[in-house]
Amino acid sequence: MGDQNTGKLNLLLAELGDTRLVSSRWLRVHDYSNSLVARYVSSGWLVSPARGVYMRKGGRLQWEGVIRSLQVGEGMPLHVGGRFALGLQGHEHYLRLGDVGTVTLYGPGRPPGWLCKLPLAQRVEYLGKGPFDLPPVSFTVEVSEAELSDQGLAWHQAAPGADALVCSTPERAMLELCDGVSDTALVYEVDALMQAMTTLRPQRVGLMLRHCRSIKAKRLFLALADRHRHAWLSHVPMDGVDLGRGKRALVPGGRLHPAYQITLPGDLDEHLA
């Protein structure tokens, strides 16, 4: 292999490290021809865990490295949100057992097809743009904490030494989860989580409420926060928060919350641990 190609290989291996992946698209953009990539594979430098994506031979295929590759390497504004983000931040014992291992992604664009074909221990679920009208942010290493914070996002390490990922803060993740509530069992889950949300930041909650387009999500979030009498709720700035009009029937035969006009299951207390 010539000096130029050896240099290109070294750059690629440095980019990949032990846990990253690169797509065929990324390789084309960075001037790695199909024939050169095929040579790297046949020489034992690269492997393809799914069609259209490559990693270092002997590397570790882990969900953290995959998401980091999407966010920073591929430049896709997909963040870890909702249920899985809350689990990462210490609330996994409140989540339904079968959902703890599902990585929930949000963003304006669907992830590449190879993502669901990777042999990961976790399932990855794309839940669309989510309930917010916020503009997408580019998740480069140069993006500031303030830019992310204005979106209800933050860099988060899933474990010591793991890749840092862009995840929803608890304020945003709770509204994302409330938006996806479609049955009584999910209300029980969100209620248990809300009970634990004793340290949410009122200004951040207000910001997320103002940018949330889902009337259901906002009313459910506020009704459950009120039900658990969280001290921060009275400090949330409600100027510019649209809660819609009329009553919302979230569950059949439920009790109407007097302030936020949304029906909640009447047996919520019985389902709290």
Task: Please tell me what each predicted stretch does.
Residues 1-84, 98-110, 114, 196-225, ...:
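Short beta-edge/loop segments at beta->alpha junctions of small alpha/beta modules
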Residues 39, 84-88, 173-177:
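Residue-level signal for well-ordered alpha-helical scaffold segments within enzymatic catalytic domains
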Residues 91-273:
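Phosphate-handling catalytic interfaces
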